[in-house]
Amino acid sequence: MNFSKRKSNFSILSVFATRLGVAALIIAALPGLTNSIARASGAGLDVEVPFEIKALKAPGLVAPYFVQDNHGTMVVSDQAGGVYSVTFAGKATALADKTKIKNPAGVAVGPAGFGSYEGSVFVLAAAGGIKGVCEVERIDKSGAVSTFAKLPDAAATECRDLEFGAANSPFAGKLYAVASGNDSIYTIDASGKASVFGTYTKPVPFELTTITFPPSSDTKAAGMMLVGMRAKGSFAAKVGRIAMVGADGKMKDEVYLVGFIRPSGFAWSPSTFGSYSDELLIADTGKFASENDNMRDGVIVRVEKDLARPFASGLMDPTDMKFIGSKAVICDPAEKGKGQGAIVIISSML
Protein backbone atom coordinates (compact mmCIF):
# COMPACT_ATOMS: atom_id res chain seq x y z
CA MET A 1 0.00 0.00 0.00
CA ASN A 2 1.28 3.47 -0.88
CA PHE A 3 1.11 5.34 2.40
CA SER A 4 2.53 8.52 0.86
CA LYS A 5 -0.68 8.88 -1.14
CA ARG A 6 -2.70 8.13 1.98
CA LYS A 7 -0.86 10.92 3.76
CA SER A 8 -1.87 13.36 1.05
CA ASN A 9 -5.52 12.34 1.27
CA PHE A 10 -5.58 12.72 5.04
CA SER A 11 -3.87 16.12 4.85
CA ILE A 12 -6.50 17.42 2.45
CA LEU A 13 -9.20 16.11 4.75
CA SER A 14 -7.52 17.82 7.69
CA VAL A 15 -7.93 21.23 6.11
CA PHE A 16 -11.53 20.50 5.13
CA ALA A 17 -12.45 19.11 8.54
CA THR A 18 -10.80 21.95 10.41
CA ARG A 19 -13.03 24.38 8.57
CA LEU A 20 -16.00 22.32 9.68
CA GLY A 21 -14.81 22.38 13.28
CA VAL A 22 -14.19 18.64 13.63
CA ALA A 23 -11.12 16.69 14.63
CA ALA A 24 -9.40 15.40 11.52
CA LEU A 25 -7.21 12.36 11.50
CA ILE A 26 -3.70 13.12 10.28
CA ILE A 27 -1.58 10.20 9.16
CA ALA A 28 2.13 10.49 9.79
CA ALA A 29 4.72 9.86 7.10
CA LEU A 30 6.55 6.63 7.82
CA PRO A 31 8.65 4.33 5.64
CA GLY A 32 6.57 1.97 3.49
CA LEU A 33 5.91 -1.47 4.88
CA THR A 34 6.15 -3.41 1.65
CA ASN A 35 9.72 -4.58 2.30
CA SER A 36 9.06 -5.53 5.90
CA ILE A 37 10.43 -8.85 7.11
CA ALA A 38 7.11 -9.25 8.89
CA ARG A 39 5.19 -9.83 5.64
CA ALA A 40 2.97 -12.90 5.82
CA SER A 41 4.20 -15.37 3.23
CA GLY A 42 2.01 -15.43 0.13
CA ALA A 43 -0.85 -13.57 1.76
CA GLY A 44 -0.25 -9.90 0.94
CA LEU A 45 -0.48 -9.12 4.65
CA ASP A 46 2.18 -6.80 6.02
CA VAL A 47 2.96 -5.21 9.39
CA GLU A 48 5.58 -2.94 10.84
CA VAL A 49 8.69 -4.59 12.30
CA PRO A 50 9.19 -5.90 15.04
CA PHE A 51 5.69 -7.36 14.80
CA GLU A 52 4.52 -10.39 12.85
CA ILE A 53 1.25 -10.96 11.03
CA LYS A 54 -0.37 -14.20 9.93
CA ALA A 55 -3.65 -15.60 8.72
CA LEU A 56 -4.70 -18.29 11.18
CA LYS A 57 -5.82 -21.58 9.68
CA ALA A 58 -9.00 -22.70 11.45
CA PRO A 59 -10.64 -25.61 9.58
CA GLY A 60 -14.42 -25.38 9.69
CA LEU A 61 -14.48 -21.58 9.94
CA VAL A 62 -15.39 -20.04 6.57
CA ALA A 63 -15.78 -16.26 6.85
CA PRO A 64 -14.93 -14.83 10.31
CA TYR A 65 -17.08 -11.74 10.96
CA PHE A 66 -16.98 -10.62 14.62
CA VAL A 67 -14.79 -11.74 17.50
CA GLN A 68 -14.89 -11.60 21.30
CA ASP A 69 -12.54 -12.68 24.07
CA ASN A 70 -13.67 -15.55 26.29
CA HIS A 71 -10.92 -15.99 28.87
CA GLY A 72 -8.17 -16.12 26.26
CA THR A 73 -10.11 -18.09 23.66
CA MET A 74 -11.76 -16.46 20.66
CA VAL A 75 -15.52 -16.53 20.14
CA VAL A 76 -16.10 -15.90 16.43
CA SER A 77 -19.21 -15.49 14.30
CA ASP A 78 -19.10 -16.85 10.75
CA GLN A 79 -20.82 -15.05 7.89
CA ALA A 80 -21.46 -18.49 6.42
CA GLY A 81 -23.43 -19.36 9.57
CA GLY A 82 -22.64 -20.54 13.07
CA VAL A 83 -20.64 -19.32 16.06
CA TYR A 84 -17.35 -20.93 17.04
CA SER A 85 -14.85 -21.13 19.84
CA VAL A 86 -11.39 -20.84 18.28
CA THR A 87 -7.99 -21.39 19.87
CA PHE A 88 -4.79 -19.67 18.78
CA ALA A 89 -3.65 -23.08 17.53
CA GLY A 90 -6.50 -22.90 14.99
CA LYS A 91 -8.91 -25.43 16.50
CA ALA A 92 -12.50 -24.33 15.81
CA THR A 93 -15.34 -25.87 17.82
CA ALA A 94 -18.95 -25.05 17.00
CA LEU A 95 -20.82 -23.44 19.87
CA ALA A 96 -23.86 -23.28 17.59
CA ASP A 97 -23.60 -24.46 13.99
CA LYS A 98 -25.22 -22.83 10.96
CA THR A 99 -28.39 -24.88 11.36
CA LYS A 100 -28.98 -23.10 14.68
CA ILE A 101 -27.77 -19.58 13.84
CA LYS A 102 -27.78 -18.85 10.10
CA ASN A 103 -26.87 -15.16 9.92
CA PRO A 104 -24.76 -14.16 12.94
CA ALA A 105 -23.00 -10.84 13.41
CA GLY A 106 -21.70 -9.39 16.69
CA VAL A 107 -20.92 -11.69 19.62
CA ALA A 108 -20.56 -10.98 23.34
CA VAL A 109 -19.83 -13.04 26.46
CA GLY A 110 -21.97 -12.48 29.55
CA PRO A 111 -20.02 -10.82 32.39
CA ALA A 112 -20.49 -11.40 36.10
CA GLY A 113 -23.54 -9.55 37.36
CA PHE A 114 -25.58 -9.79 34.15
CA GLY A 115 -28.40 -11.75 35.70
CA SER A 116 -27.61 -15.46 35.76
CA TYR A 117 -25.92 -15.30 32.36
CA GLU A 118 -22.25 -15.09 33.23
CA GLY A 119 -20.34 -17.05 30.57
CA SER A 120 -23.27 -17.32 28.16
CA VAL A 121 -22.52 -16.32 24.57
CA PHE A 122 -24.86 -13.75 23.05
CA VAL A 123 -25.17 -13.30 19.29
CA LEU A 124 -26.80 -10.55 17.25
CA ALA A 125 -28.32 -12.38 14.30
CA ALA A 126 -30.75 -11.75 11.47
CA ALA A 127 -33.93 -13.78 11.77
CA GLY A 128 -34.82 -15.46 8.49
CA GLY A 129 -32.73 -14.02 5.64
CA ILE A 130 -29.57 -11.94 5.85
CA LYS A 131 -31.64 -8.73 5.65
CA GLY A 132 -34.08 -9.90 8.30
CA VAL A 133 -34.86 -8.31 11.64
CA CYS A 134 -32.00 -8.45 14.15
CA GLU A 135 -32.52 -10.49 17.31
CA VAL A 136 -30.22 -11.35 20.18
CA GLU A 137 -29.74 -15.09 20.57
CA ARG A 138 -28.23 -16.76 23.63
CA ILE A 139 -26.08 -19.87 23.56
CA ASP A 140 -25.98 -21.44 27.00
CA LYS A 141 -23.15 -23.60 28.30
CA SER A 142 -24.91 -26.77 27.08
CA GLY A 143 -25.06 -25.42 23.51
CA ALA A 144 -28.80 -24.75 23.53
CA VAL A 145 -29.86 -21.66 21.55
CA SER A 146 -32.78 -19.42 22.51
CA THR A 147 -33.97 -15.94 21.60
CA PHE A 148 -32.94 -13.58 24.40
CA ALA A 149 -34.24 -10.26 23.04
CA LYS A 150 -36.19 -8.89 20.11
CA LEU A 151 -35.32 -5.35 19.07
CA PRO A 152 -38.37 -3.03 19.15
CA ASP A 153 -39.55 -1.37 15.95
CA ALA A 154 -36.75 -3.08 14.01
CA ALA A 155 -37.67 -3.40 10.36
CA ALA A 156 -35.30 -5.14 7.95
CA THR A 157 -31.92 -4.31 9.41
CA GLU A 158 -28.23 -5.00 9.00
CA CYS A 159 -26.93 -6.60 12.18
CA ARG A 160 -23.47 -5.44 13.23
CA ASP A 161 -21.72 -5.24 16.59
CA LEU A 162 -22.81 -6.50 20.01
CA GLU A 163 -20.97 -5.37 23.15
CA PHE A 164 -21.45 -5.27 26.90
CA GLY A 165 -20.93 -1.86 28.48
CA ALA A 166 -17.60 -1.37 30.19
CA ALA A 167 -17.45 -2.17 33.90
CA ASN A 168 -17.40 0.85 36.23
CA SER A 169 -18.80 3.08 33.49
CA PRO A 170 -22.24 4.62 32.89
CA PHE A 171 -22.84 1.78 30.41
CA ALA A 172 -22.14 -1.10 32.81
CA GLY A 173 -24.70 -3.88 33.19
CA LYS A 174 -26.26 -3.42 29.75
CA LEU A 175 -25.83 -5.10 26.38
CA TYR A 176 -25.64 -2.84 23.30
CA ALA A 177 -26.65 -3.97 19.81
CA VAL A 178 -25.87 -2.14 16.56
CA ALA A 179 -28.40 -2.34 13.72
CA SER A 180 -26.97 -0.37 10.83
CA GLY A 181 -30.05 -0.64 8.63
CA ASN A 182 -32.00 1.31 11.25
CA ASP A 183 -29.14 3.73 11.96
CA SER A 184 -29.72 2.68 15.57
CA ILE A 185 -28.13 1.26 18.69
CA TYR A 186 -30.27 -0.70 21.14
CA THR A 187 -29.76 -1.35 24.84
CA ILE A 188 -30.79 -4.64 26.45
CA ASP A 189 -31.01 -5.43 30.16
CA ALA A 190 -30.56 -8.75 31.95
CA SER A 191 -34.28 -9.51 31.66
CA GLY A 192 -34.06 -9.39 27.87
CA LYS A 193 -35.93 -6.10 27.59
CA ALA A 194 -34.64 -4.08 24.64
CA SER A 195 -35.13 -0.39 23.91
CA VAL A 196 -33.74 2.15 21.47
CA PHE A 197 -30.60 3.74 22.89
CA GLY A 198 -30.07 6.17 20.02
CA THR A 199 -30.87 6.70 16.34
CA TYR A 200 -28.33 8.55 14.22
CA THR A 201 -29.81 10.12 11.10
CA LYS A 202 -28.66 13.74 11.49
CA PRO A 203 -27.18 15.60 9.75
CA VAL A 204 -27.33 12.51 7.48
CA PRO A 205 -28.15 8.82 8.05
CA PHE A 206 -25.10 6.86 9.15
CA GLU A 207 -23.96 3.33 8.45
CA LEU A 208 -22.92 2.06 11.88
CA THR A 209 -20.10 -0.46 12.12
CA THR A 210 -18.82 -1.04 15.64
CA ILE A 211 -18.81 0.27 19.21
CA THR A 212 -16.30 0.24 22.03
CA PHE A 213 -15.62 1.96 25.33
CA PRO A 214 -12.40 3.93 25.94
CA PRO A 215 -10.27 3.50 29.06
CA SER A 216 -10.73 5.96 31.90
CA SER A 217 -7.31 7.40 31.07
CA ASP A 218 -8.67 8.78 27.79
CA THR A 219 -9.43 12.35 28.81
CA LYS A 220 -11.18 13.17 25.55
CA ALA A 221 -13.76 10.38 25.67
CA ALA A 222 -13.80 9.03 29.24
CA GLY A 223 -17.33 7.94 30.14
CA MET A 224 -18.37 7.85 26.48
CA MET A 225 -19.24 5.18 23.94
CA LEU A 226 -17.21 5.32 20.73
CA VAL A 227 -19.08 4.42 17.53
CA GLY A 228 -17.59 3.68 14.11
CA MET A 229 -19.72 5.15 11.33
CA ARG A 230 -19.83 6.36 7.76
CA ALA A 231 -22.37 8.62 6.05
CA LYS A 232 -24.71 6.46 3.97
CA GLY A 233 -24.62 7.05 0.23
CA SER A 234 -21.45 9.10 0.46
CA PHE A 235 -19.01 8.92 -2.45
CA ALA A 236 -16.26 10.82 -0.63
CA ALA A 237 -13.41 8.51 0.38
CA LYS A 238 -12.44 9.69 3.85
CA VAL A 239 -15.70 10.53 5.60
CA GLY A 240 -15.69 7.56 7.96
CA ARG A 241 -15.43 8.62 11.58
CA ILE A 242 -15.42 7.57 15.20
CA ALA A 243 -18.17 9.43 17.03
CA MET A 244 -18.64 10.00 20.76
CA VAL A 245 -21.99 9.08 22.30
CA GLY A 246 -22.95 9.86 25.89
CA ALA A 247 -24.81 7.62 28.33
CA ASP A 248 -27.99 9.46 27.30
CA GLY A 249 -27.61 8.09 23.75
CA LYS A 250 -26.92 11.50 22.23
CA MET A 251 -24.07 11.89 19.78
CA LYS A 252 -21.66 14.73 20.51
CA ASP A 253 -21.09 17.45 17.92
CA GLU A 254 -17.35 16.95 18.23
CA VAL A 255 -16.06 13.73 16.69
CA TYR A 256 -13.33 11.63 18.23
CA LEU A 257 -11.50 11.00 14.93
CA VAL A 258 -12.39 11.37 11.26
CA GLY A 259 -10.60 10.46 8.05
CA PHE A 260 -11.33 6.79 7.43
CA ILE A 261 -13.18 4.98 4.69
CA ARG A 262 -15.04 2.58 6.99
CA PRO A 263 -13.70 2.21 10.58
CA SER A 264 -14.66 -1.30 11.58
CA GLY A 265 -12.85 -2.10 14.80
CA PHE A 266 -10.74 -0.23 17.33
CA ALA A 267 -9.13 -1.14 20.63
CA TRP A 268 -6.39 -0.06 23.01
CA SER A 269 -3.31 -2.28 23.04
CA PRO A 270 -2.27 -3.97 26.31
CA SER A 271 1.00 -3.27 28.09
CA THR A 272 2.33 -6.54 26.65
CA PHE A 273 2.03 -5.38 23.02
CA GLY A 274 5.72 -4.74 22.48
CA SER A 275 6.83 -1.16 21.92
CA TYR A 276 3.28 0.00 21.13
CA SER A 277 1.59 -0.63 24.45
CA ASP A 278 -1.45 1.39 25.52
CA GLU A 279 -2.06 2.82 22.05
CA LEU A 280 -5.30 2.98 20.08
CA LEU A 281 -5.33 0.72 17.02
CA ILE A 282 -8.01 1.12 14.36
CA ALA A 283 -9.05 -1.26 11.59
CA ASP A 284 -10.33 0.42 8.42
CA THR A 285 -12.19 -1.88 6.03
CA GLY A 286 -11.63 0.41 3.07
CA LYS A 287 -13.93 -0.36 0.16
CA PHE A 288 -15.49 -3.80 0.18
CA ALA A 289 -13.65 -6.31 -2.01
CA SER A 290 -16.79 -6.76 -4.10
CA GLU A 291 -16.71 -3.03 -4.93
CA ASN A 292 -13.06 -2.64 -5.95
CA ASP A 293 -11.95 -5.80 -7.78
CA ASN A 294 -10.60 -7.44 -4.63
CA MET A 295 -8.08 -4.69 -3.92
CA ARG A 296 -6.37 -5.19 -0.56
CA ASP A 297 -7.03 -1.71 0.83
CA GLY A 298 -7.88 -2.78 4.39
CA VAL A 299 -5.42 -1.31 6.90
CA ILE A 300 -4.64 -1.03 10.60
CA VAL A 301 -3.41 2.31 11.92
CA ARG A 302 -2.20 3.21 15.39
CA VAL A 303 -2.77 6.56 17.06
CA GLU A 304 0.17 8.15 18.83
CA LYS A 305 -0.04 11.71 20.13
CA ASP A 306 -3.08 12.41 17.94
CA LEU A 307 -1.28 11.19 14.82
CA ALA A 308 -2.47 8.10 12.97
CA ARG A 309 0.52 6.08 11.85
CA PRO A 310 0.39 3.18 9.37
CA PHE A 311 0.85 -0.12 11.16
CA ALA A 312 -0.44 -3.00 9.00
CA SER A 313 -1.71 -3.32 5.44
CA GLY A 314 -2.81 -5.84 2.84
CA LEU A 315 -6.07 -6.85 4.49
CA MET A 316 -9.12 -7.42 2.31
CA ASP A 317 -12.26 -6.59 4.34
CA PRO A 318 -11.43 -6.36 8.06
CA THR A 319 -14.74 -6.24 9.93
CA ASP A 320 -13.73 -6.40 13.60
CA MET A 321 -10.66 -6.18 15.82
CA LYS A 322 -10.04 -7.02 19.47
CA PHE A 323 -7.01 -7.57 21.68
CA ILE A 324 -7.01 -11.02 23.24
CA GLY A 325 -4.11 -11.49 25.61
CA SER A 326 -1.11 -9.85 23.97
CA LYS A 327 -2.34 -10.33 20.38
CA ALA A 328 -4.41 -8.20 18.02
CA VAL A 329 -7.14 -10.36 16.47
CA ILE A 330 -8.80 -9.20 13.25
CA CYS A 331 -11.73 -10.83 11.44
CA ASP A 332 -11.50 -10.66 7.64
CA PRO A 333 -14.33 -12.61 5.97
CA ALA A 334 -12.79 -12.18 2.50
CA GLU A 335 -9.08 -12.47 3.29
CA LYS A 336 -8.55 -15.15 0.65
CA GLY A 337 -11.44 -14.07 -1.61
CA LYS A 338 -15.22 -13.86 -1.36
CA GLY A 339 -16.49 -16.36 1.19
CA GLN A 340 -12.93 -17.42 2.02
CA GLY A 341 -11.99 -15.54 5.14
CA ALA A 342 -9.43 -15.81 7.89
CA ILE A 343 -8.65 -14.65 11.39
CA VAL A 344 -5.60 -12.39 11.13
CA ILE A 345 -3.26 -12.32 14.14
CA ILE A 346 -0.68 -9.60 14.90
CA SER A 347 1.90 -10.33 17.60
CA SER A 348 4.95 -8.55 18.96
CA MET A 349 8.27 -10.32 18.32
CA LEU A 350 9.92 -8.57 21.27
Please place each PLM-identified region on the residue numbering.
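N-terminal secretory signal peptides that target proteins for export/translocation
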Residues: M1-F16
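Bacterial N-terminal signal peptides
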Residues: A17-G32
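Blade/loop signatures of beta-propeller domains
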Residues: A40-V49
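A short beta-strand motif characteristic of beta-propeller blades
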Residues: V49-P59, K91-K98, A144-D153, K193-T201, ...
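Beta-rich, blade/repeat-based domains predominating
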Residues: P59-G72, K100-S120, V133, D153-K174, ...
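Short loop/turn segments immediately following the C-termini of beta-strands
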Residues: D78-Q79, A125-G128, A179-G181, S216, ...
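A short loop-to-beta-strand structural motif that recurs across blades of beta-propeller domains
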Residues: G82-S85, V133-E137, D183-T187, K238-A243, ...
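Short loop/turn segments that connect beta-strands within beta-propeller blades
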Residues: V86-K91, I139-A144, I188-K193, V245-K250, ...
